[in-house]
From Swiss-Prot:
It is found in: Cytoplasm. Keywords: Cytoplasm, FAD, Flavoprotein, NAD, tRNA processing. NAD-binding protein involved in the addition of a carboxymethylaminomethyl (cmnm) group at the wobble position (U34) of certain tRNAs, forming tRNA-cmnm(5)s(2)U34. It comes from the Bacteria. One of its GO terms (biological process) is tRNA wobble uridine modification. It comes from Helicobacter acinonychis (strain Sheeba). Its cofactor is FAD. GO terms for cellular component: cytosol. Belongs to the MnmG family. The keyword Cytoplasm applies. SMART domains: GIDA_assoc_3 (SM01228). This is tRNA uridine 5-carboxymethylaminomethyl modification enzyme MnmG. Homodimer. Heterotetramer of two MnmE and two MnmG subunits.
Length: 621
């Protein structure tokens, strides 16, 4: 049977959900093919969304019309702001989720969305005509023709599950791997490599002894992810903290020879920032204990996820290991930990739209691009979906810059640098992180969302008004010069604020940590009518004013630099500071400007600085 659609999405994980929903929302006739409809939106690993850097991604996805934020706000069990004591740039919202509620909400959203159809089958191969994808074939002899295809296969491409010496061809424990499609992608000439990730054991809640364990509460004023969420009053369940101990470590050390990670059984590289417990004990042998979090998987608390105990050790070793841990002495293991090895395609094979360079109309998103994490997958799925629709309409692509969004950092890192290990987002990856805070996501991306047709006009008008109020009042505060007059000193004293000794403008005064929103309203009467959302932005902009201005200067400098032309006869070879790889790529592609050079995978900002310097020296010589 032959079926037709505008856009075809392969895979119903977190990338596939966002890709299919956004494509349908933007008016494209979309079809999603997934192996199991019941596992759409399944959280295969930890039952949580958000975190450091990841919370930023989730909120950006939400503002740009994505679903992850609203699904999380409707399925969370505990909400916290991580790094709450630090500056706003590095804070991250995180939620424990009810895995069942999240999955059901996501599945129903997909099934009930207009313009979007779903079928349960396995994609086996791509149909390519004149280096352009035109559809796929499936395991039940269906043929789907489409103008654009987005592949979001997660860990299913030639997936192999490892538990001790036992191996099985699975894309997730108990589910078939996608071997035919994996072979097809290799045959098409993509640069395919292997990665590895793992998951932690789960134990029955009734078998845990919580007495003596440290209880970990949610925030009193719980944060939420979606700007559309109203009247937020979620259930807040506790997590619990326990630790490994020297006995635990010795059990694991005694079985290193049986660990697939060390025996040579696993060849793929695992996530650097989420190592297995056997890897942690091997690498940090001096540590006497490692922290573990017991996290409820659902509101029923029937199963708990042991966060921090990712492992692929044999079953008997997992049993012995878990029973050596305080609170888990009599724990009943409901699901064992395992490692999974899978194919991914080097993301340098992609453009910034996530379309492959090799095959027109083919987009890749999620773990197939070498990333790890639900949020990273969702962000890529969203961007692939948006750009597939824009290409369908012959409109300009939507590419976020590194100074606009963490999504921009994520995609730029992937397509220009590639990766040899599972890539996850951190705030430290963003050089402009003071500008890319969670709290200003709406102000950063609202205009983009509106022009893409992904934000309602009335809300955008309100947002635009808020943005204007922020800019106008910051300008007014900068122009407002205060002197240590009797009146000013008296008003400061009444607010329990330290006196000023010299002239100071309003921005510098509000940079004080002690100057609360209430004090701002009281001291500067023109701020009194402003909403809390606007006041918070003004406060943050005042506090980090010097650094924010510096980052804006750096952006302007970079934008100016990228406009610099490269002479036709410019010789790249022999320039100190350029690696052999950079020279080879520059000689091969002969970019006409530094902007074109910046688009070449493997060319770093440091390379661009060196080129800029030597172009300048040549012009002046």
């Amino acid at each position: 049977m032959v079926k037709e659609s505008d856009i075809l999405v392969v895979g119903g994980g977190h990338a596939g959900i966002e890709a299919s929903l956004i494509a349908a929302k933007m008016g494209a006739k979309t079809h999603l093919i997934t192996m199991l409809i019941d596992t759409i939106g399944l959280a295969s690993c930890n039952p949580a969304i958000g975190g450091l850097g990841k919370g930023h991604l989730t909120k950006e996805v939400d503002v740009l019309g994505g679903a992850m934020g609203i699904i999380t706000d409707n399925s969370g069990l505990q909400y916290r702001v991580l790094n709450a004591s630090k500056g706003p740039a590095v804070r991250g919202t995180r939620a424990q989720i009810d895995m069942d509620t999240y999955r059901i909400f996501a599945r129903n959203l997909v099934l009930n969305t207009p313009n979007l159809s779903v079928s349960q089958e396995m994609t086996e191969s791509l149909i390519i005509e004149n280096d352009e994808v035109v559809g796929v074939t499936t395991n039940i002899n269906n043929t789907y023709r489409a103008k654009k295809v987005i592949i979001t296969t997660g860990t299913f491409l030639k997936g192999v599950v490892h538990i001790g010496e036992h191996q099985n061809q699975n894309g997730r424990f108990g589910e078939n791997a996608s071997n035919s499609l994996a072979l097809n992608l290799r045959e098409l000439g993509f640069k395919v490599e292997r990665l590895k990730t793992g998951t932690c054991p789960r134990v029955a809640g009734k078998s845990i002894n919580f007495e003596g364990l440290e209880e970990h509460f949610g925030d009193t004023n719980p944060p939420y992810f979606s700007y559309k969420t109203k009247n937020f009053n979620p259930t807040q369940l506790s997590c619990f903290i326990t630790y490994t101990n020297p006995t635990t470590h010795q059990i694991i050390r005694d079985n290193f020879h049986r660990a697939p990670l060390f025996s040579g059984q696993i060849e793929g590289i695992g996530p650097r920032y989420c190592p297995s417990i056997e890897d942690k004990i091997n690498r940090f042998s001096e540590k006497e204990r490692h922290q573990l979090f017991l996290e409820p998987q659902t509101i029923h608390k029937s199963e708990y996820y042991i966060n921090g105990l990712s492992t692929s050790l044999p079953l008997d070793v997992q049993e012995e290991t878990i029973h050596s841990i305080k609170g888990l002495e009599n724990a009943l293991i409901t699901r064992y930990g395992y490692a999974i090895e899978y194919d991914f395609i080097q993301p340098t094979e992609l453009t910034h739209t996530l379309e492959t360079k090799k095959i027109k109309g083919l987009y890749l998103a999620g773990q197939i691009n070498g990333t790890t994490g639900y949020e990273e997958a969702a962000a890529q799925g969203l961007m692939a979906g948006i750009n597939a629709v824009l290409a369908l309409k012959n409109q300009a692509p939507f590419i976020l810059k590194r100074n606009e969004a963490y999504i921009g950092v994520l995609i730029d890192d992937l397509v220009t640098k590639g990766t040899n290990e599972p890539y996850r987002m951190f705030t430290s990856r963003a050089e402009y992180r003071l500008l890319l805070r969670e709290d200003n996501t709406l102000f950063r991306l609202g205009e983009h969302a509106y022009h893409l047709g992904l934000m309602e006009k009335d809300f955008y008008k309100e947002l635009k008004k808020d943005k204007q109020e922020i800019q106008e009042n910051l300008k007014r505060l900068k122009e407002c010069v205060l002197t240590p007059s009797k009146e000013v000193l008296k008003r400061l004293s009444e607010l329990d604020e330290n006196p000023i000794n010299d002239k100071i403008n309003g921005v510098d005064l509000l940079a004080r940590d002690s100057f609360s929103l209430e004090k701002m309203r009281s001291f500067f009467s023109f701020l009194a009518p402003l909403s809390e959302r606007v006041l918070e932005q003004i406060k943050i902009e005042c506090k980090y004013n010097i650094y924010i201005e510096k980052q804006h200067e750096n952006i302007a400098k970079m934008d100016s630099m990228l406009k610099v032309s490269i002479p036709k006869d410019f010789v790249f070879k022999g320039i100190p500071g350029l690696s052999l790889e950079a020279v080879e790529k520059l000689e091969k592609f002969r970019p006409k400007s530094l902007f074109e050079a910046s688009e070449i995978s493997g060319i770093t900002p440091a390379n661009l600085d060196v080129l800029h310097l030597y172009i300048h020296l040549r012009k002046n010589s």
